[in-house]
Amino acid sequence: MHPDVIADLNALDTTLRTCESVVDVEELRRRIDELEHQAADPGLWNDQEHAQQVTSQLSHAQAELRRIVALRERLDEMPILYELAEDEGPDAVADADAERASLRDDIAAMEVKTMLSGEYDERDALINIRSGAGGIDAADWAEMLMRMYIRWAEKHDYGVEVYDTSYAEEAGLKSATFAIKGPYTYGTLSVEMGTHRLVRISPFDNQGRRQTSFAEVEVLPVVETTDHIEINENDIRVDVYRSSGPGGQSVNTTDSAVRLTHIPTGIVVTCQNEKSQLQNKVSAMRVLQAKLLAVKRQEERAEMDALKGDSGSSWGNQMRSYVLHPYQMVKDLRTEYEVNNPSAVLDGDIDGFLEAGIRWRMSENQSA
């Protein structure tokens, strides 16, 4: 093998060994054994919510183990691959180089995953998107962002559960709430929190003028029973109404949609995508619990910031700009990471932004 190839493989081995140490593969195997034992308990499904959490944790742990084991196998096979390729000729060597580049990207992604060590990072993600300034274009932009995150989830074989979509009168969404279910989706997507800005020629403007639109993205961890988020029923006002679709048209003949108002905090949650009022209420309660957990965490952070004399991060500020006209560029304003292919980004190709955001957050935390 060429000395440069040997040096690169040695560097990849060092990085992967660090990942294996951080993940603690043997502890992960023990955790899987423990969860499999719980999952085999005949009485597990007496508590369906707890059972779903156990099976979800087991699935996440198994996926993480498979991923890191597969990386080790691929890396260990690289010297053999190069040995065979050098016997076959330049085309085979080029294929080996391509596999090495792919492996390098995958190990880098695993390295980023090891940076997700927060208390809730391994949870599923609950995403709220709200259209901001920009009228009909902003509503359309909110819907484009929702599609972007769902496409990202699909590319990673993650599950998506839509709780609520509030459509605007002409086009697009006023707001949307949905969960992305997969290992570390909250930790990964939490760097998406903030204001997203779109600049383009408006498809809704007969004069073809350029329009700037804004949408706010909120990312929360999905609440589990261990979080002990208690909600007093007397603190909740429940309103029911008919589900509506695009243009405000009713899509249900019964009052199945649910709106919950948490009176002490003023938090309002709606859910209309389930088939029954009961299902919508259960889903709305999950979202409300996630929002109350976020309030609790925010209060705790404020107390810590006060002790440290730290003003804290302002996630409400603009964090990414998507320019479709007069040039094409998507740029993260925190990390400076940018690409000139907005179409791919809006189709869910956001891993580069996520990895850069996670590295940036770790750097910020270390310097705080």
From Swiss-Prot:
Alphabetized InterPro entries for the sequence:
PCRF, Pep_chain_release_fac_I, Pep_chain_release_fac_I_sf, PrfB
Q: What is a single molecular function from GO for this protein?
A: translation release factor activity, codon specific
Q: Which residues carry this modification: N5-methylglutamine?
A: 249
Pfam families per UniProt: PCRF, RF-1
Briefly state the modifications made to the protein after translation.
Answer: Methylated by PrmC. Methylation increases the termination efficiency of RF2.
- What's the superkingdom here? Bacteria
**Classification via PROSITE patterns:** RF_PROK_I
What broad class describes the main subcellular location of this protein? cytoplasm
Q: Which UniProt keywords apply?
A: Cytoplasm, Methylation, Protein biosynthesis
**What subcellular locations does the record give?**
Cytoplasm
Q: Which GO terms describe its cellular component?
A: cytoplasm
The UniProt similarity line reads: Belongs to the prokaryotic/mitochondrial release factor family.
What biological function has been recorded for the protein in this entry?
Answer: Peptide chain release factor 2 directs the termination of translation in response to the peptide chain termination codons UGA and UAA.
The UniProt entry, under HAMAP family, shows:
Rel_fac_2 (MF_00094)
What protein am I looking at? Answer: Peptide chain release factor 2
Its gene is prfB
